[in-house]
Amino acid sequence: MKLIIFTGLILFAIVSLIEAQANNEKACLPQYQVCTDAPGNCCSNLVCDCYGRYKSGARIGRNCFCLLKGVIYKREN
């Protein structure tokens, strides 16, 4: 009986470790992908860069994208 309980606990621990490792290895977001809801999921060479959207001086939203680190994007007219 003790052996069955011990084996069950060991199997539970192994399954928990496998699930925890799978959660830590989520795929990262590539360049130009939306990261508004997941700012920490951009790939290592990218940063989640956000900007506000305005209409008639009032803020109407916020957009975030995975962009290259250190690159400055300017608006073209």
Curated annotation (Swiss-Prot):
Propeptide residues, per UniProt? 21-26
Task: Quote the subcellular location field of this record.
Answer: Secreted
Q: Name one GO molecular function term.
A: toxin activity
One short Pfam name that applies is Toxin_35
Can you supply one Gene Ontology CC term for this chain's record? Answer: extracellular region
Main subcellular location of this protein, as a coarse class: secreted
> What post-translational modification information does the record give?
Contains 4 disulfide bonds.
Q: Where expressed (tissue)?
A: Expressed by the venom gland.
Question: What does UniProt give as the signal peptide span?
Answer: 1-20
Give a yes or no for keyword Secreted in this entry. Answer: yes
Q: Which domain of life is it from?
A: Eukaryota
The record's family statement is: Belongs to the neurotoxin 19 (CSTX) family. 08 (U8-Lctx) subfamily.
What is the name of this protein? Answer: U8-lycotoxin-Ls1j
